Amino acid sequence: MTMPLSVTVCQKIDQAIAKYPAGREQSAVMAALTIVQSERGWLSPESLRDVAAYLNMPPVAVYEVASFYSMYHLKPVGRYVLTLCTNLPCLLQGADKAARHLQEALNIGWSETTADGMFTLLQGECMGACQEAPVLLTNHHRMCCKMTPPQIDALLAQLRAEAAGKERDE
C-alpha cells in the first residue's frame, strides 16, 4: 500500500494545473504522472488512482496515458534506468555491441532489473542524436553518446559511485 500524495507532490501538481485554463486540470495528467513517478520511482496502481482522484479523472484514463508512454514505469525499476537506442542508425554504429556489453556487465536482459535494484535496462526508440550513435539515456534525462564498451564501463562505475555517495549522505 502506498502513501497518499505528499504535500510537496500536490504543490508541484498544482503548479502544473495552474498552466491550464480553469476546469482543465486533466490537461496536467502527464506532468502529474512525472511528478509522482519522480517521488515514488514508479507508478503503482495506487499511484495511478491517486493521480486520477487528484485530477478528477477516471482511473482508466490515467492508466491509458501511463501505459502509452515509455517514460512511465508501471512496475518497479532500478535506481538507474538505462535506455539504449536500438534503431538502425545506432545499430549501424555499434548499439548491438553496446547492448551485449550492458547485458553481460549487468547480468540482465532487456526490461530486467539487477538483483541489487541498481539498474534497469530498456530498449529505446530513436532519441534524435543519430550523429552521436550509439546513444544511451540514463533515467530519461541524461544522454550519453558514442557508447563503446569502455565508456559503458566508466558510466556504470560512475553511477555506482554516485549511488554509494548518496547512500552515505542519507
Each language-model region and where it sits:
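Signature of N-terminal electron-transfer/Fe-S-associated modules in redox systems
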Residues: 1-170
